[in-house]
A protein has these predicted regions:
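Hydrophobic/aromatic beta-strand elements that line small-molecule binding cavities or substrate pockets
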Residues: 85-90
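Sequence-pattern detector for short linear motifs
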Residues: 5-6, 46, 71, 178
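C-terminal segment of classical bacterial N-terminal signal peptides
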Residues: 15-19
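Sec-dependent N-terminal signal peptides
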Residues: 5-14
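A glycine-rich, hydrophobic loop/mini-helix early in the fold
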Residues: 79-84
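Non-cytosolic coordination micro-motifs
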Residues: 21-66, 93, 98-182
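A low-complexity, Ser/Thr/Gly/Pro-enriched, surface-exposed linker/loop concept
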Residues: 60-78
């Protein structure tokens, strides 16, 4: 009996490594730029990293709404030999909460990026023809077609989303009631 238990335990110890995924935590940014950073720090880091093609304050815009700033960079126009194309850095209350990196499709294909992300971070939490999404408590990272990588600070995004909720129209409420009755 003891030999059987020992054999089962040994088998379990040997088989577990084959089924456990050795993945990294989802990153909260790229190229030294991370979600939650203040505006001035992001500007400084963008200046130091030529891969993004940042040209200084002329790339900074104010967005409609309260406390919203956008930095838009263009690595292709910056004559930088980059794997990146246009990148967007969106701020709320002076802190970075969305990073969108458009990847140069002439240099990298969608499948290569998807395969690399799966190997590093495991399988996506959700998958559709349009996008693949990886999530943890603080960050959502999505790979979207044609070839964009997006990082979102979940807490800030949810806060802004709840502030902007518009009541449903009568048609929407009726539709919901119909669907609930099915």
């Amino acid at each position: 009996m003891k030999k059987d238990v020992a054999a089962v335990l040994l088998f379990c110890l040997l088989i577990v490594p084959f089924f456990s995924e050795d993945t990294n935590p989802i990153p909260n940014g790229y190229g030294g730029i991370e979600l939650g950073m203040p505006l001035d720090e992001v500007k400084d880091r963008l200046m130091k990293n030529s891969e993004f093609g940042y040209h200084g304050d002329r790339d900074v815009s104010l967005l409609p709404g309260e406390n919203r700033i956008l930095i838009e960079t263009d690595a292709a126009a910056g004559h930088v030999d980059s794997f990146l194309d246009r990148c967007y850095f969106q701020f709320y209350d002076g802190r970075l909460y969305i990073i969108i990196i458009n990847i140069n499709t002439e240099r990298v294909d969608h499948y290569s990026v998807f395969d690399t992300l799966c190997k590093k971070y495991g399988n996506p939490a959700s998958l559709s023809p349009e996008k693949s999404v990886w999530k943890n408590n603080g960050v959502t990272m999505s790979l979207e077609r044609p070839l964009s990588l997006k990082y979102v600070d979940n807490k800030v995004f949810d806060e802004l989303n709840s502030k902007s909720l518009v009541p449903k129209s009568g048609t929407e409420m009726t539709r919901d009631m119909f669907l609930e009755g099915l």
